């Protein structure tokens, strides 16, 4: 059975963009409050009082449009992936589509699959454009993740997102998709029930049965189907709930950490959930050279992974400077203390 996912028409990334809020809190500051002295990351991004997954998605989408240099009316789909969208009943995609000027001739939907909701939207965009149904489609992954006060997730749950505009492969695409593959099972490693404010995690399922099993199987199957090895890739971006997990995956697969570090941002902005690998790939595209090949593997609890192989094209040299680069946002910082952080994240119950 053919496992590789590849559309009828070759497609690529016409434009991409990321956004990370400027506020930061040091892991040490969170640890001070809860009496913890060892931390999985250095610091994380915190959304401002007027920011949420929707506003992050809009900023990322606008940056993607700047690089794409296309009329937003040509975008026939705006698909938004998040597990922290601001409305329980009301699509976020419609607001983003309106904000960027893509309405009314456009399909919109909100995708959910924990931390791989954004790449799930991307898989759909690839198929939508690759089938000939549309010239362009936009996929966005963004989150303002929450962690229960004092829980280890509070140290890593960050904020940020990225958007990718998919179009038919041409001289205008900054990178093209060689193929993709999705690997999914029913694994209860992480969940949040309706009306609950904070997620829960099934500790014994978190590592090996969920994250490592799915990412490694997705990566290996994609490479086997494409006839590639780890040596054929110049960069690798894996889902990054922390710094340790993606580096462990790289070691298991035999990928030098030097190929992983450029897209590994969790240590300085936190885990951006649906935005994690998408923000990482945007950072890699900001520095990659034409001909570079990128291995991109997401993970979403519940559980599943999407794996992509993309090859950078000549257009990247011109387009990368048309919008703020990912590290421009990462390096733009304003530190806050735990009291302001708790206020911004609405942890105070009045």
UniProtKB/Swiss-Prot annotation:
Q: Name one GO biological process term.
A: farnesyl diphosphate biosynthetic process, mevalonate pathway
Keyword Kinase assigned to the entry: answer is no
Pathway, per record? Metabolic intermediate biosynthesis; (R)-mevalonate biosynthesis; (R)-mevalonate from acetyl-CoA: step 2/3
Q: Which UniProt keywords apply?
A: Acyltransferase, Isoprene biosynthesis, Transferase
Q: What sections of the protein cross the membrane?
A: none
The UniProt catalytic activity note for this protein reads:
acetoacetyl-CoA + acetyl-CoA + H2O = (3S)-3-hydroxy-3-methylglutaryl-CoA + CoA + H(+)
| Residue sites binding CoA per the record | 204, 244
- Indicate which residues the UniProt annotation says bind (3S)-3-hydroxy-3-methylglutaryl-CoA: 115, 156, 206, 239, 271, 301
Q: Does the keyword Cytoplasm apply?
A: no
Q: What is its EC number?
A: 2.3.3.10
What start and end residues bound the annotated signal peptide? Answer: none
Q: Active site annotated at which positions?
A: 83 (proton donor/acceptor), 115 (acyl-thioester intermediate), 239 (proton donor/acceptor)
Molecular function (Gene Ontology), one example:
acetyl-CoA C-acetyltransferase activity
Q: What class of enzyme is it?
A: transferase
HAMAP family noted in UniProt: HMG_CoA_synth_arch
The job of this chain, per UniProt, is described as: Catalyzes the condensation of acetyl-CoA with acetoacetyl-CoA to form 3-hydroxy-3-methylglutaryl-CoA (HMG-CoA). Functions in the mevalonate (MVA) pathway leading to isopentenyl diphosphate (IPP), a key precursor for the biosynthesis of isoprenoid compounds that are building blocks of archaeal membrane lipids.
Assembly and interactions?
A: Interacts with acetoacetyl-CoA thiolase that catalyzes the precedent step in the pathway and with a DUF35 protein. The acetoacetyl-CoA thiolase/HMG-CoA synthase complex channels the intermediate via a fused CoA-binding site, which allows for efficient coupling of the endergonic thiolase reaction with the exergonic HMGCS reaction.
| Family of this protein | Belongs to the thiolase-like superfamily. Archaeal HMG-CoA synthase family.
Q: Which NCBIfam families match?
A: HMG_CoA_syn_Arc (TIGR00748), PRK04262.1 (NF003274)
Protein name, as recorded: Hydroxymethylglutaryl-CoA synthase
Which species expresses this protein natively?
Answer: Thermococcus onnurineus (strain NA1)
Q: What is the lineage of its organism?
A: Archaea, Methanobacteriati, Methanobacteriota, Thermococci, Thermococcales
